């Protein structure tokens, strides 16, 4: 009977997730995942993007109360903008809450001034993430008071669909954007494993409002997908025979060891990575002359690697039959105990 686990174990799996933050801010990151089976880059990228933009918990202002103002079609004495414009500006305020319960923030300023989000008294449990965001223009000797209710939620909730029931007279519900992720884009490129060059590389660009770091947002989105998909697994996994038959291989199992598991200097490791040398089998097929032609790879790096290969009774310039095997990642996992 065909092993059920072969359905997922035989597939190529990503080696790691690489995060690269942009120098101007920690709220933007480039995330690279490789290698993936062909088609999986688009599948995972689209699923992650949808979850990131719709399902993460965040905080937002859900209602406001301005003395003597009962609805959004009013005007505020001394304020250049009408109430609907002020509400639109308030929707752009990004907040972070350190508690799950709702909090009420206070705003009290006297003109003339440009009123910004940083002037709001948030207390200890709420943090304004964009304090320079403009709320309105206040005229000279005029005063503006406002109470702003902040809550935790997810997604985008219209004021007409607000879960705020029985708001007091004069308190105005506003549209609330809870999602801490501002934008997600992705693209899929080809990447190489051994001699095969048509695997997928998923590259995602994630920007948050500062409530979460992009790395955390991606991790939470992956966990949400994991929880949702778990229900579809409706079978019991079979016990696999853990006996590894090393004599079935036409080459040494040490060739299946990944070069990033070797204790190499950073310079040597980067040279191998840039030259797409993944496994020791890829490495020993190269000659010393081949290696010295690799950019930034010198005699010192060559001698370092020769010493490590000698520990496994291996050398450069070896003739390895049937390399690379089609199921190289599965073999590497199966024979892991043999070379560790």
Swiss-Prot record:
Reactions this protein catalyses: RNA(n) + a ribonucleoside 5'-triphosphate = RNA(n+1) + diphosphate
Region (Alpha C-terminal domain (alpha-CTD)): 251-340
Chain intervals for the UniProt region annotation (Alpha N-terminal domain (alpha-NTD)): 1-236
Molecular function terms, GO-annotated: DNA binding; DNA-directed RNA polymerase activity; protein dimerization activity
Entry EC no(s): 2.7.7.6
Keyword hit for Transferase: yes
CDD domains per UniProt: RNAP_alpha_NTD
SMART domains: RPOLD
GO biological process, alphabetically ordered: DNA-templated transcription
One Pfam match: RNA_pol_A_CTD
GO cellular component, one term: DNA-directed RNA polymerase complex
Family per record: Belongs to the RNA polymerase alpha chain family.
Known partners and oligomeric status: Homodimer. The RNAP catalytic core consists of 2 alpha, 1 beta, 1 beta' and 1 omega subunit. When a sigma factor is associated with the core the holoenzyme is formed, which can initiate transcription.
Main function: DNA-dependent RNA polymerase catalyzes the transcription of DNA into RNA using the four ribonucleoside triphosphates as substrates.
Descriptive protein name: DNA-directed RNA polymerase subunit alpha
Organism: Rickettsia massiliae (strain Mtu5)
Name of the gene this protein is made from: rpoA
């Amino acid at each position: 009977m065909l092993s059920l686990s072969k359905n997922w174990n035989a597939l190529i799996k990503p080696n790691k997730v690489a995060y690269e933050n942009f120098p101007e801010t920690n709220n933007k990151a480039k995330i690279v995942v490789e290698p993936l089976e062909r088609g999986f880059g688009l599948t995972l990228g689209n699923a992650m993007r949808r979850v990131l933009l719709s399902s993460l918990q965040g905080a937002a202002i859900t209602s406001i109360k301005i003395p003597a103002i009962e609805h959004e079609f009013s005007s505020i004495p001394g304020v250049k903008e009408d109430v609907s414009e002020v509400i639109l500006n308030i929707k752009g305020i990004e907040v972070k809450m350190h508690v799950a319960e709702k909090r009420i923030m206070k705003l009290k300023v006297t003109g003339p001034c440009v009123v910004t989000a940083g002037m709001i008294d948030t207390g200890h449990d709420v943090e304004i993430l964009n304090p320079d965001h403009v709320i309105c223009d206040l005229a000279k000797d005029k005063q503006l008071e406002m109470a702003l209710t902040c809550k935790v939620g997810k997604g985008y909730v219209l004021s007409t669909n607000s879960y705020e029931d029985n708001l007091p007279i004069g308190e105005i519900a506003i549209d609330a954007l809870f999602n801490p992720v501002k934008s997600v884009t992705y693209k899929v490129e080809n990447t190489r494993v051994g001699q095969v060059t048509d695997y997928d590389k998923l590259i995602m660009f994630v920007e948050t409002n500062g409530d979460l770091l992009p790395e955390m947002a991606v991790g939470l989105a992956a966990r949400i997908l994991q929880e949702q998909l778990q229900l579809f697994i409706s079978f019991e996994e079979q016990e696999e025979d853990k006996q590894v038959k090393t004599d079935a291989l036409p080459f040494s199992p040490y060739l299946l060891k990944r070069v990033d598991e070797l204790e190499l200097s950073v310079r040597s490791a980067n040279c191998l990575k840039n030259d797409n040398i993944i496994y020791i089998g890829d490495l020993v097929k190269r000659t010393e002359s081949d290696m010295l032609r690799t950019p930034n790879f010198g005699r010192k790096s060559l001698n370092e690697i020769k010493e490590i290969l000698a520990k496994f009774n291996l050398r450069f310039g070896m003739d390895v039959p049937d390399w690379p095997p089609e199921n190289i990642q599965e073999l590497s996992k199966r024979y892991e105990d043999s070379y560790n």
